[in-house]
């Protein structure tokens, strides 16, 4: 952890709630940070925040819905394509997923006594992969094969760590 707090100005674009935490999407005003574009800051990690008299023009082409399009949480992952993902969930886990959808694009494609299949349109970012793994053996990636292979690789690494 960092002991020294940084102080800097930003142009706030929007705030987003994810997993009971608030985040601010903002663009830094110094040349180094301005050229990086909007970044995401966790509000609970900000020690002090205040307004200034400085104003800015919100870019007309920027929208929060476009910025977070296909995102599971707050990891934007514009370097990842938006995929059509199919997850198979045990009947018990499917009840939970129905009550608390994993993503706004969630559609139940199939349902029977043993399992349900859910479809999503999103990016396979780190936080979505964590969510799949969080569901343990109760959820299986059916499509795309590339994501299934990625999950399998993570599980194999985990298995190696617990070999002994």
Residues covered by each model-derived region:
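Core beta-strand-centered patch of the WYL/Sm-like small regulatory domain
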Residues: 1-85
